[in-house]
Amino acid sequence: MPREIITLQLGQCGNQIGFEFWKQLCAEHGISPEGIVEEFATEGTDRKDVFFYQADDEHYIPRAVLLDLEPRVIHSILNSPYAKLYNPENIYLSEHGGGAGNNWASGFSQGEKIHEDIFDIIDREADGSDSLEGFVLCHSIAGGTGSGLGSYLLERLNDRYPKKLVQTYSVFPNQDEMSDVVVQPYNSLLTLKRLTQNADCVVVLDNTALNRIATDRLHIQNPSFSQINQLVSTIMSASTTTLRYPGYMNNDLIGLIASLIPTPRLHFLMTGYTPLTTDQSVASVRKTTVLDVMRRLLQPKNVMVSTGRDRQTNHCYIAILNIIQGEVDPTQVHKSLQRIRERKLANFIPWGPASIQVALSRKSPYLPSAHRVSGLMMANHTSISSLFERTCRQYDKLRKREAFLEQFRKEDMFKDNFDEMDTSREIVQQLIDEYHAATRPDYISWGTQEQ
């Protein structure tokens, strides 16, 4: 029985990565840009109905809700070849179309005003599912709509659908170059509070690392957003292959999440993908074996989160799930796992078993692939806290000088005080502390003694 998943795309970034994601899914399932199953797509082994449903005339429609406070990106989607794919009733653009001006508070308070319209769409979509498993939210944490409206939606989804899973694909801003959004640290911190408290699982897409991978590995000089978004859609589609081409394990979202998240707050995941090549000539030379793929996944240069090396803390893996696609002999997997353990290629937590799991998944029969085997690693690693520390440092700098707070004062939430920011800062600090605690053997009893 398929457990359906509803995708919510928010703001410029969320809609752009969502668009690439659906493009990729259509290609993998042999669905044309209009939603019609192609003549050649005759294999019935994939489950399309987790992410799509069929309209009366048999064509497939994504279970997606497209939301934005300004029209530009959604209009470009509606002028693309994929315009007819989406259900037009599931597209919401705010009336005045002014956007949230890269301001979290504006996005959040607009959410309060329009929440009935938005939840009409979401509830209708949820009622149309036989057994809804949960929601996937695509957004960025630095702007206004993805962060503010995203935060508002996360809170409301918890109230309205307390038993449903909420997974997010959250894009973190690029730290290598100056941001064009001066209030980015405020936006990020306020969103992080919601991601900590209201999401079950957050897949961190770090623009810093994605840009580095595009330049170093794919040899693109100045990667454009659309090239980065292609990387993101590769990750998103690979992380859902076990749901769409079901095997024995991990064939629903809770199965994926349960194997990676042993303690509820430490639910921020990083991803790695290999082989990353756009260049066909290189691709054909390499022999990709399971061990190759699994070893490469553990190399920092393939991991899509840029974390500083912290000498004081022994950062370690809490859990790893490798999704291996392609022609794989299961005995090879066992050997590779043994090799990784023997050679101690990965450093695991001292308070629990070394949890490294492998899910085997088929590749799409309709896409020619340059590699025999490719792999996605989803890892729960304590060094992700360095990403939050960076956000906190930037936030503290601005907050100390009370810089750029006028834009926030305009909204009711911050009219009298900035308590919301200060509590968010505390919650993110607790999250960082817990990640540090998880590197020590006494983490099991952490939080039980009086501190």
From Swiss-Prot:
The modification Phosphoserine is found at S131. GO terms for cellular component: apical part of cell; cell leading edge; centriole; centrosome; ciliary basal body; condensed nuclear chromosome; cytoplasm; cytoplasmic microtubule. Phosphorylation at Ser-131 by BRSK1 regulates centrosome duplication, possibly by mediating relocation of gamma-tubulin and its associated proteins from the cytoplasm to the centrosome. One of its GO terms (molecular function) is identical protein binding. Pfam families: Tubulin, Tubulin_C. It is found in: Cytoplasm, Cytoskeleton, Microtubule organizing center, Centrosome; Cytoplasm, Cytoskeleton, Spindle. The keyword Aminoacyl-tRNA synthetase does not apply. Keywords: Cytoplasm, Cytoskeleton, Disease variant, GTP-binding, Lissencephaly, Microtubule, Nucleotide-binding, Phosphoprotein. PROSITE patterns: TUBULIN. InterPro entries: Gamma_tubulin, Tub_FtsZ_C, Tubulin, Tubulin/FtsZ-like_C, Tubulin/FtsZ_2-layer-sand-dom, Tubulin/FtsZ_GTPase_sf, Tubulin_C, Tubulin_CS. Disulfide bonds: none annotated. One of its GO terms (biological process) is mitotic cell cycle. GTP binds at A142, G143, G144, T145, G146, S147, G148. The keyword Cytoplasm applies. It is linked to Cortical dysplasia, complex, with other brain malformations 4: A disorder of aberrant neuronal migration and disturbed axonal guidance. Clinical features include early-onset seizures, microcephaly, spastic tetraplegia, and various malformations of cortical development, such as agyria, posterior or frontal pachygyria, thick cortex, and subcortical band heterotopia and thin corpus callosum in some patients. Belongs to the tubulin family. Tubulin is the major constituent of microtubules, protein filaments consisting of alpha- and beta-tubulin heterodimers. Gamma-tubulin is a key component of the gamma-tubulin ring complex (gTuRC) which mediates microtubule nucleation. The gTuRC regulates the minus-end nucleation of alpha-beta tubulin heterodimers that grow into microtubule protafilaments, a critical step in centrosome duplication and spindle formation. Component of the gamma-tubulin ring complex (gTuRC) consisting of TUBGCP2, TUBGCP3, TUBGCP4, TUBGCP5 and TUBGCP6 and gamma-tubulin TUBG1 or TUBG2. TUBGCP2, TUBGCP3, TUBGCP4, TUBGCP5 and TUBGCP6 assemble in a 5:5:2:1:1 stoichiometry; each is associated with a gamma-tubulin, thereby arranging 14 gamma-tubulins in a helical manner. Gamma-tubulin at the first position is blocked by TUBGCP3 at the last position, allowing 13 protafilaments to grow into a microtubule. This is Tubulin gamma-1 chain.
